[in-house]
């Protein structure tokens, strides 16, 4: 049997707010001490913990804000602009964009599975 999961559509939105912040602001823009949106060192999966959510509207606004701030962090930069990963490995903006495509593709797939469980409709 599969155990319970905290995966939810709202959790995915919250998670992507964290991901946008982590790669564009904390890594690319060098704001390493910028805190988390929902997570913490104590609760690394806080983005999926909906026991005390701020509310869906606030979560969607937070996601939108992080996307706008990510756009601002990347504005005017070359795809070859480099930064250091947490481990100190040099990386570039091109890598972030490719990674974000992977992140969104993966989590859109998760969202599709959740939607299918609700409405039973499958794709072509």
Predicted regions and their residues:
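Short, contiguous alpha-helical
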Residues: 1-45, 85-124
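Acidic/histidine-rich alpha-helical segments that form the ligand environment
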Residues: 44-84, 94-100
């Amino acid at each position: 049997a599969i155990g319970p999961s905290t995966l939810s559509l709202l959790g995915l939105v919250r998670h992507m707010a964290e991901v946008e912040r982590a790669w564009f602001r904390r890594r690319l823009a060098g704001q390493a001490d910028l805190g988390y949106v929902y997570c913490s060192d104590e609760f690394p999966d806080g983005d999926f913990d909906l026991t005390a959510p701020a509310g869906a509207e606030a979560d969607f606004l937070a996601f939108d804000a992080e996307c706008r701030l990510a756009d601002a962090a990347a504005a005017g930069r070359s795809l070859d602009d480099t930064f250091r990963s947490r481990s100190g490995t040099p990386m570039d903006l091109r890598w972030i964009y490719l990674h974000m495509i992977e992140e969104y593709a993966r989590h859109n797939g998760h969202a599709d599975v959740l939607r299918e469980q609700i409405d039973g409709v499958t794709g072509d």
